[in-house]
Amino acid sequence: MIVTIDGPAGSGKSTTAQRAAARLEYVYLDTGAMYRAVALGFLRAEAPATRSGAEAVLPSLTVDVEYRGDTMQVFLGDDAVTDRIRSAEVGRVVSDISTLAPVREYMVEQQRRIGRAQADRHGGVVLDGRDTGTVVFPKAPVKIFMVADIDERARRRLQEYEAAGEEVTFEEVRAEIEQRDQQDRTRDIAPLRRADDAIVFDTTDCTIAEQVDFVVDRVKAQDGRGT
């Protein structure tokens, strides 16, 4: 079983996907974290967010994941970067980098490889991102598109930054999310959009437990299997 959860920044995708996967005894693949690892690779190489920058960085870049219990660990080469990719610095550049055609081609290939392998190994995988149900696994049997009010999304993202020790204001985070929304909706390659057969779920007033229940219930009601 392959389950995709897409939506804008701060809509609750990652936490919901991770906990739903644990409830279902599947594994969780955070595609956004993989893009953040690529962005960190660009920053370390001091490469511009351009096609030429991608062509310089990608040949020597290796992004992979490992699972330790229910937790997904992200690696950039041999370096564990799960915590570092959540920095505000990475957040400011990841959207520009993720729109580059060479980056998206590389990442979609990796996400399909890992997703299929983990679904075969564990019986199912839950992915979250922005194009998992439209590009990565367009035939997934369960697709959910999560949305939420922008102020609520900014509040959630601010909490993530504060937990990581970042000093940013609510206004800065809200502006960052507005910019990310615009970039995600208008980019030429794989813009953020709802798949025609995706279920729309507004999480603005929902608790995490309610969000997880929603996903788990939809998966249990679906007997198909998609790749």
Swiss-Prot record:
One of its GO terms (biological process) is pyrimidine nucleotide metabolic process. GO terms for molecular function: ATP binding; CMP kinase activity; dCMP kinase activity. Its EC number is 2.7.4.25. Keywords: ATP-binding, Cytoplasm, Kinase, Nucleotide-binding, Transferase. ATP binds at residues 7-15. It is found in: Cytoplasm. One of its GO terms (cellular component) is cytoplasm. It catalyses: CMP + ATP = CDP + ADP; dCMP + ATP = dCDP + ADP. CDD domains: CMPK. Belongs to the cytidylate kinase family. Type 1 subfamily. This is Cytidylate kinase. It comes from Salinibacter ruber (strain DSM 13855 / M31).
